[in-house]
A protein has these predicted regions:
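Helix-turn-helix
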Residues: 7, 11, 15-61, 72
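Hydrophobic/aromatic residues within well-ordered alpha-helical segments
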Residues: 47, 54, 58, 62, ...
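Hydrophobic recognition helices of helix-based DNA-binding modules
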Residues: 54, 58, 62, 66, ...
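Amphipathic alpha-helical packing segments from all-alpha helical-bundle domains
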Residues: 81, 105-115, 125-151, 163
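Hydrophobic/aromatic-rich alpha-helical bundle segments in the mid-to-C-terminal region
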Residues: 128-136, 150-183
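Solvent-exposed, amphipathic alpha-helical segments
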Residues: 11-19, 65, 117, 167, ...
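Hydrophobic alpha-helical connector segments
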Residues: 67-108, 161-168
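Short helix-capping/turn signature of helix-turn-helix
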Residues: 44, 115-123
Length: 183
């Protein structure tokens, strides 16, 4: 059976999401991929290399605004609808990837992704900058939408763009977290 790098990443995503990083051995990952350990190390010499590649693809690339949202110029209401659609579509895509028919803990597949995020926070070197960049992207999106809404008269002219954008973003960040945890 021929296994390529993309297949290794997808199968490793499932393993890391359903197990702790420490518990997932290279041997188990290789077996799941239909490879020998040597075959796995051809693609990723160390488990951390594989974990970082999984995080880069399925956390950082997936959560990047250019991959998550399809905004068109419009009203604040349309922006909110497009933002929600982007979050929901992203989670549906991730759940489809994670749902391989194997659910050892009986958890929501959304929760497995949340579990992966916590591991990324613990094990990905210098992750703070990458997380901050995602947060900043979202904050800029909301600032831009609030600024446009203020200029177009959709919201009061005396509202502070920065504070209003933070309020909206924090509300949707909470909503997105609840979406991750729902069954």
């Amino acid at each position: 059976m021929f296994t390529n790098r993309d297949e290794v990443l997808e199968k490793a995503l499932r393993i890391f999401a359903k197990m702790n990083y420490e518990k997932a051995s290279q041997m188990e990952i290789a077996k799941t991929c239909g490879l020998s350990k040597a075959g796995l190390t051809y693609y990723f010499p160390f488990k951390l290399d594989l974990f970082m590649a999984v995080a880069d693809r399925y956390v950082f690339d997936t959560q990047h605004s250019k991959n998550k949202f399809n905004f068109t110029d419009g009203s604040l209401s349309e922006f909110i609808d497009q933002y929600i659609a982007g979050v929901e579509n992203t989670m549906q895509r991730l759940v489809r990837l994670l749902d391989d028919g194997n659910n050892p803990s009986g958890c929501s597949f959304n929760f497995y992704y949340y579990h992966l995020l916590m591991q990324v926070r613990l094990y990905y070197p210098n992750v703070e900058q990458k997380i901050a960049a995602i947060f900043e992207q979202n904050h800029r999106l909301w600032k831009s939408a609030i600024h446009r809404a203020k200029e177009n008269g959709e919201i009061r002219s005396d509202l502070d763009v920065e504070e209003t954008a933070l309020m909206f973003w924090q509300m949707f960040f909470w909503w997105r977290t609840m979406l991750l945890l729902r069954h």
